[in-house]
Amino acid sequence: MDYLVKNGVLVTGEGQRRGDILVSGGKIAALGTGLAQEGAQVLDASGCLVFPGFIDVHTHLDMECAAGVTADDFPSGTRAALAGGTTCILDFATQDKGGTLQQALDAWHRKAAGKSACDYGFHMAITDWTEDIPQQMEAMCRQGVTSFKVYLAYDNLRLTPEQVGKVLSAAARLGALVCAHCEDGDAVNQGVARQKALGNMGPQAHPLSRPNWVEGSAVAQFLDLAKQAGAEAYVVHLSTREGLEAIRQARQGGQTVWAETCPQYLTLTDQVYALPDFEGAKFVCSPPIRSQADLEALRQAAQAGEIQTVATDHCSFRFHGQKDLGKEDFSLIPNGLPGIQHRPLVMYALSQGDCPLTPSQLCALLSEAPAKIYGLYPRKGSLEVGADGDLVIWDPNAPVTIRAKDQLQATDYTPFEGWACPGSPRTVLLRGQIRVQDGQVLEGFPGQFIPRSTR
């Protein structure tokens, strides 16, 4: 079936214009005004914004952890993503200790193949350094996995600074990109022990155990290692003024640094950890949600283009049966928030209120820049002829209120409960086929693995 999207406002990162889009054979076939195509089904987008499909470059689906497995697997997580207008995700395949990168990639393909409602790709998290890791990274790139993650925290995941430097050097040679979880792991361990020694065992101890400087110093260290390696760098889930300042300094020194933040760091403050009845546990994530001053600094950075992407770090757990495992010890609360469904809604609401952003800025943050940075562009994140027919017809006059009871995410809460969003996706196309109609996700799992190019 061919589709002709008529009379919409076409939004790209560069601007917006009124026009039509013809989608044929799964691709964008023509752009213009007054387009006609015999046999094409017309989708009237009058009064609507038409975005390229949104891309979430930071998700954790079907991930094993101390609390068992994350609440969302690929079927539930990708259906939830589509409901919000996200047509492609990048999930983190993670190397096991003693395992190879190929074994991790094979495992993630098994998790996702035939079980994804939207398209997907993988980053590869390197957690166990061996001298042949550079060769393994090259093999990943040949298979379309062209980005790698390193952790500076978590004893079971982190590499040494020397090993991080070697990963960065290998990535620079390959034209790959390294992204990093930037928290000082030793400082976190000491902070957790300190809070426990003081008898602070509730959710409020979580942010106290990893204050702002823990992120700021780790960002600075990672970027210094990237500079020594001659590598571009990507900082995930930026949450603090200190981390932002470290990025600014590196950029002033001539480095290429990409910055990502998440909706929770743009909308919530650390007051959530003081909620009664253990409700604060719902918001335990790492890095933690920060102060109003940090929130304001990140909003200004997003408006100024200093932050390139807004992803979710979707790592969902149920409050009952998972989060409450840490009721007597905050360090046992599974770290992570759900957000894969509501990122576009929250960001659109924010753009119309407390953090004014143009539709073009939203497009850049949610679609175009993620695609360009991670080797998906122009197949994804684009309204160009030849791009995949991934489209979001966004109705700015279709308000919704976010409620956990209505969500497709497989969790029993949302951190954005009660948020009033002035607009929402009406129709979502994935590779030229309608997958969301009038806000309802259609059945089926047509999502495909999308190999990515090196830089």
Q: For each of these PLM feature ranges, what is it?
A:
Residues G8, I21, G26, G47, ...:
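Divalent metal-coordination and catalytic microenvironments
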Residues M1-G53:
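Histidine-rich, glycine-flanked metal-binding segment
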Residues A45-K115, D132:
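Metal-associated gating/positioning segment near the N- to mid-region
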Residues Q204-G230, G280-K282, A304, Q308-V310, ...:
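His/Asp/Glu-enriched, well-ordered alpha-helical/loop segment
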Residues T86-L90, S116-G121, V145-S147, L225-A233, ...:
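Short, surface-exposed connector motifs at secondary-structure boundaries
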Residues Q135-V310, G326:
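Histidine/acidic residue-rich metal-binding segments in metalloenzymes
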